[in-house]
């Protein structure tokens, strides 16, 4: 790997034109130019999506870092910050062309980790294809590989009709509410392996967040797809379980208003019949999507490998496997085996 000459710094408004061109090149149609190897790229970089009004009380939604060399932008790294959980997610990492592109990307990641730790970030997330040394780059920077996620896609075409209120009620499907937080936490614990639960550290309070702020359960595509509308539903268990609140499934639907696929994330118990739940989800998209674009956009659904047989139920519903991505994470906190008093520090 060639050693690059240059420096990493925070992006400035005057970098916008160069950033837009670099992002466009890295997210072209050729697979080799996708910086992280994800099958869906984000919307083009624009001044309104990346830079907010310079008010001291507000932080920009995204943080950008660039690699500058000889007055030119040779690389960029963009992260989405979840202020509620102090988690940062890498959504773009570009360095197009040149023999030292790998070193440029590594230096951007190292700068991100240093700057994020100073700003109180507790976890860094990234999802990438296991190609072009993506996984090796992040593991060299201290990230831990904890799972894989299959990306399934349903091509535009015939979609189920929206359900009536009576059909929805009879199937035990209803919109979520903050009161479902405990039941959703139990559902997540029932379908997620213990090691992944410890790494993701999803709290009951995270399940209370609604709408666009909902970031659980995590997937590789949530930070990249910028939804106009997000809808969430639960599938109630027949009989309600021991305490009457048990849930068999959770559904998150993102209806895209841009030139991107609609989004579907399902979490369900292995023994639950989710086929009606999936048909309901597709009906929600038909009902909520812009009718002029419904026939052009497909539906994309991420499924983690340990969530089987959910992937087979999606394939039965017309979805096909288009990619597999690797999930990695780095923690800045130190885990302890036993609680104890430690010296306090000031950030």
Predicted regions and their residues:
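A short beta-loop-alpha structural element at the N-terminal edge
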Residues: 7-33, 171-202
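Active-site rim helix/loop that mediates acceptor-substrate recognition in acyltransferases
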Residues: 31-64, 198-230
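Conserved beta-strand in the GNAT
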Residues: 66, 72-80, 234, 243-255
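A short, internal acetyl-CoA/4′-phosphopantetheine-binding micro-motif in the GNAT/acyltransferase core
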Residues: 80, 91-103, 264-278
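A conserved beta-turn-beta hairpin within the catalytic core of GNAT-like acetyltransferases
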Residues: 81-91, 255-265, 323
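Conserved acetyl-CoA-binding loop-helix of GNAT-fold acetyltransferases
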Residues: 100-116, 140, 273-288
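Conserved GNAT acetyl-CoA-binding A-motif
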Residues: 116-129, 291-304
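Conserved active-site alpha-helix within GNAT-family acetyltransferase domains
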Residues: 130-147, 304-323
